[in-house]
Amino acid sequence: MDTFSVVFYETLSGDKPAKVFLNELSDKQRAKTIRDLKILELYGNRLREPQSKYLEEGIYELRTKQGSNISRILYFFFVGKCIVLTNGFVKKSMKTPKDAITLAVKDRKSVV
């Protein structure tokens, strides 16, 4: 089974929002998220709920829960077997924040 490659989206100024988000998580939450990213690399577009969910306009969310902490990293699939991580957030409500999705869609359009 071929694995996918996971890369961080990089802005024109060189920032990598998903990487910054990942580094800001607690050690336990970061470890679980990295574990989930490895699962995403392995299963790619075959990964389904509860780990991954399609949102809209080609954007998916990787869902990680550690205790009462729930984090999400938004991503999209690119040419070949490439997964681009755009941004992340700690979930505080039942719905994914619209501004986070809008940012991910904008980032996707700048790449595709």
Where are the regions that the model predicts?
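Basic, Lys/Arg-enriched alpha-helical interface segments
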Residues: M1-I70, V79-I83, K92-V112
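ATP-dependent carboxylate-activation loops
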Residues: T86
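Residue-level signal for short, function-critical loop segments
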Residues: F89
